Amino acid sequence: MADGELNVDSLITRLLEVRGCRPGKIVQMTEAEVRGLCIKSREIFLSQPILLELEAPLKICGDIHGQYTDLLRLFEYGGFPPEANYLFLGDYVDRGKQSLETICLLLAYKIKYPENFFLLRGNHECASINRIYGFYDECKRRFNIKLWKTFTDCFNCLPIAAIVDEKIFCCHGGLSPDLQSMEQIRRIMRPTDVPDTGLLCDLLWSDPDKDVQGWGENDRGVSFTFGADVVSKFLNRHDLDLICRAHQVVEDGYEFFAKRQLVTLFSAPNYCGEFDNAGGMMSVDETLMCSFQILKPSEKKAKYQYGGLNSGRPVTPPRTANPPKKR
């Protein structure tokens, strides 16, 4: 689609019009518009580094997972672009009801504000994963499989990590035993699928674990877990202050690890309607002071759940290789 044919402003207006409407209200978009978003944003991703070097102030958000109403709440809280600069840590699609609206608004903002709005790749921005967990079905139901493949081409070009003011390392999952130098990330060629093992896989899939020293097996059946010692060594070696990552549900929307050397952000409150978690967003000011803005879980959703708030649901989901698909 030629640049002139994609009216990003019109699309953003439509996507924001559902604010205040009943949650889940579908936004009408044409296939040509959505395809245009994928093609144009892909060009921008490829024109920018795979390892982004960003400057504060900015706001950092974790997983969204198709919870479009909550994404709009985040922007209401943090300021709609370009009022604030944003970095999202991946996992835009799957599981929630409105992956299409979610990813389309994010891509539209990327096109409109390419130097102020940044998106990293999560493990769900990968065909083999979002084929299973909802995005493929949503694309097929509302458009067609060809459009899902166009999204795959776009996702294969997303940046993988970011460093804020040379001090805060950001990625979706975590560290890798293969990561010795930042140059290794810069050398990853795009477009690329996410391999089953190795550096790119680990950056999108690994998890911190307080019970591990060094590297451990990951219950997900993919990548590794890493201990506080690994975090400290990594920060020292690269003269960094903090690792900021997403990838796991945390009760308060953010959770520290390794004496505040790592923080997990998760920005989808009431995740999947199954958890009573809050959603968190981290604001980094010009002095690199970090503060947290929290979207509380809504009581309303919780009361419809079997057993109510005291049913003893775990804070984080069991991390199996193939979690059951909720239907």
UniProtKB/Swiss-Prot annotation:
- InterPro entries, per the entry: Calcineurin-like_PHP_ApaH (IPR004843), Metallo-depent_PP-like (IPR029052), PP1_catalytic_subunit (IPR050341), Ser/Thr-sp_prot-phosphatase (IPR006186), STPPase_N (IPR031675)
User: In the record, what terms sit under GO molecular function?
Assistant: metal ion binding; myosin phosphatase activity; myosin-light-chain-phosphatase activity; protein serine/threonine phosphatase activity
Compartments where located? Cytoplasm; Nucleus
Q: In which tissues is it expressed?
A: Detected in gizzard (at protein level).
What reaction does this enzyme carry out catalytically? Answer: O-phospho-L-seryl-[protein] + H2O = L-seryl-[protein] + phosphate; O-phospho-L-threonyl-[protein] + H2O = L-threonyl-[protein] + phosphate; O-phospho-L-seryl-[myosin light chain] + H2O = L-seryl-[myosin light chain] + phosphate; O-phospho-L-threonyl-[myosin light chain] + H2O = L-threonyl-[myosin light chain] + phosphate
The cofactor remark states: Binds 2 manganese ions per subunit.
Question: What residue spans carry the region label Disordered?
Answer: 305-327
Instruction: Say which domain of life the source belongs to.
Output: Eukaryota
- The catalytic residues are H124 (proton donor)
- UniProt keywords, alphabetically: Acetylation, Carbohydrate metabolism, Cell cycle, Cell division, Cytoplasm, Glycogen metabolism, Hydrolase, Manganese, Metal-binding, Nucleus, Phosphoprotein, Protein phosphatase
User: Which biological process terms from the Gene Ontology are attached to this UniProt entry?
Assistant: cell division; circadian regulation of gene expression; glycogen metabolic process; regulation of cell adhesion; regulation of circadian rhythm
Q: What is its EC number?
A: 3.1.3.16, 3.1.3.53
Q: What activity regulation does UniProt give?
A: Inhibited by the toxins okadaic acid, tautomycin and microcystin Leu-Arg. The phosphatase activity of the PPP1R15A-PP1 complex toward EIF2S1 is specifically inhibited by Salubrinal, a drug that protects cells from endoplasmic reticulum stress.
Record-linked PANTHER family: SERINE/THREONINE PROTEIN PHOSPHATASE, SERINE_THREONINE-PROTEIN PHOSPHATASE PP1-BETA CATALYTIC SUBUNIT
Family that this chain belongs to:
Belongs to the PPP phosphatase family. PP-1 subfamily.
Name the chain's protein.
Serine/threonine-protein phosphatase PP1-beta catalytic subunit
